[in-house]
Each structure stands twice: as C-alpha cells, then as structure tokens.
Regions:
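Single conserved hydrophobic/aromatic residue that forms the stacking wall/gate
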Residues: 1-7, 12
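Basic, nucleic-acid-binding surfaces and adjacent catalytic neighborhoods in DNA/RNA-processing proteins
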Residues: 19-35, 49, 146-274
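Short, conserved beta-strand segments within well-ordered enzyme catalytic domains
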Residues: 20-22, 47-49, 55-58, 64-70, ...
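Active-site-flanking structural segment that lines cofactor/substrate pockets
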Residues: 32-50, 57
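A short catalytic or substrate-binding loop motif that flags glycine-/basic-rich loops and adjacent residues
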Residues: 47-51, 87-90, 240
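Glycine-centered tight beta-turn/hairpin loop motif at sheet-sheet or coil-to-beta transitions
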Residues: 60-62, 100-102, 251
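Phosphate/anion-contacting hairpin/loop surfaces
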Residues: 65-170, 175-182, 190
Length: 274
C-alpha cells in the first residue's frame, strides 16, 4: 500500500495539498476524532512512511495522519485524470479526501476494524499506539544476535513471540508462517531455544519473505487490494500458508499441516520444521 501511495503513478504526489476531507462514518475500531478534518484540510503533504502496520502522512502544519487498515480496510487512490468510474459511491467508503491537484483518496472498510487519527509530529513516539512498538522487520537491527538476546529465556511458542508487536513491529500471521517454514523452524518450539545459526537464518528469511511480498504487491485473500484496485500476487508464492494437505517443498516428503495457535491458523511442515 505505502509503495503505491508514494512511488507509482497512482500516488498522492508529494507537496499536494489536501483540499477537502469528508468523514462519512466515525465509528471505526476507535472513533475518528471530530477535529480530524480541520487538522488535515488546507495543508500540504510533506512525507509518507510506515511504522509497523500504520500508514503515516505528515502535513505542512506538523500534523500526522495515522491510518491502520485493520482486517478489511483499503486505501484506493484515484489520480487526477482518472478515467474509470469513481468508487467514492461504493459501499463502505467511510472517508474521502481530495487534493488540490485532483487526486482522490478513499478509505473503504467493510468490517470497520481499521482506525484513523491525527497527532502532532512531536508527539508521535509517545502516542499510545506507537510507544511500545518493536523494531522494524526490514531494518538492519533485525539480526541473529539481536533475536538471541531478545528471545532469551522466553518459553512462549516461537510463532507467538514473532507476532508480538512489542518485539518486531509489523509482522503478521501469513508472513510469520512463511518465514518460519523457510528457516526450517517449528512454530511450536520455545522462542528462547533458538541457536545462533538458526537465529541468523530466521532474521534473513523474515526480511526476504517480506521483500518478496512487497515486490509482488502483497497477498490478496478476501479483502486486500492495492491502491489501484488490483490484486497482489504473493499468495501464489506461499509455501505453507493455506496449503494444508499439500506436499512441502522441502524434499523430505513432508505434508503441510494446520493447527490453531492463539486463535489463529498456523501452517507448517512437521518434517522439516524443528
């Protein structure tokens, strides 16, 4: 989503000014604040980036627009000169923003599990949803020695530890399943049992899995689409997720199994993941 917003022809262009913002429903996971519009409209877009699973858009007045897509949220960008019919009248479009250049940004969320807020840029790190986030999974900080140190003594299952946003911010269920399979590590073993070579391999596979997913435009299940409305393609490269009963690619005649962990589906190969 973020790369589409900042890097492609379907983008919100840097320095574009938000001319108007319409909030149609405020009752998302957390209510959209009543003063969101006054802090966004009339100000230029200066910077776009991501922290964990949040999209952050900094404006010229020092406000940061914080967006979380939740389970089913979509950001749809209709650039100026867009020739297709607008989706602004589509069901579940809760927020419509327009720039002075004619770009239109829609927030669509059928389940309303997402969130939208604003905060002053000097208060971002202390915001309740930001203050306790861990390191970024694509950062150089994620390395074998760091994992060994942070997981030492933890008896929680490996998968549960990796999904803890206080440890690594932004990892989700699909990508943890995939990275653990690539690293040949069981999702059920104690997190503190990692050996140095395993930790090095796991850190590398987390980054590789995420980068491949980004390059493929993400994974499309029921709800996810890119900002241009197209599907992502990484689901075609999944090695274990959603492949229960299929042969694992490990070559050890393993068959992919599914188990429930903390209310989520875990897919793994018992033959190669130890």
């Amino acid at each position: 989503i973020l790369r589409c917003l900042v890097g492609s022809e379907m983008c919100i262009r840097d320095s574009a000014e938000i001319a108007h913002i319409e909030v149609r429903r405020r009752d998302l996971r957390w209510p959209i604040p009543d003063d969101l519009e006054q802090h966004l409209a009339g100000h230029r877009i200066m910077r776009l980036w991501r922290r964990a699973k949040y999209i952050l858009i900094e404006l010229s007045n020092g406000a940061i627009w914080m967006i979380h897509l939740g389970m089913s949220g979509r950001m749809i960008v209709e650039p100026s000169g867009h020739n297709e019919p607008s989706k602004r009248t589509a069901p579940h479009v809760h927020v419509v923003a327009e720039t002075t250049r004619g770009d239109v940004v829609l927030y669509q969320d059928a389940r309303r599990f997402g969130s939208m807020d604003w905060i002053s840029n000097d208060q971002l790190e202390s915001h309740p949803r930001m203050a306790n986030l861990g390191i970024e999974p694509l950062s150089e900080a994620l390395a074998g020695p760091w994992l060994i140190k942070r997981l030492a003594g933890k008896v929680a299952p490996m998968k549960a530890a990796l999904l803890d946003q206080r440890l690594i911010a932004g990892l989700g269920n699909i990508y943890v399943c995939e990275a653990l399979n690539r690293a040949r590590i069981s999702p059920f073993r104690e997190a503190g049992s990692l050996k140095p070579a395993e930790a090095k391999r796991l850190a590398a596979e987390i980054r590789a899995t995420l980068q491949e997913a980004i390059d493929a435009g993400g994974s499309s299940l029921r709800d996810y689409v890119r900002t241009d409305g197209e599907l992502g393609y990484f689901q075609h490269a999944w090695r274990v997720y959603g492949r229960e009963g299929e042969a694992c690619s490990c070559g050890k005649k393993g068959v992919i199994e599914r188990a429930a962990q903390s209310g989520r589906s875990t897919f793994y190969c018992p033959a190669c993941q130890r």
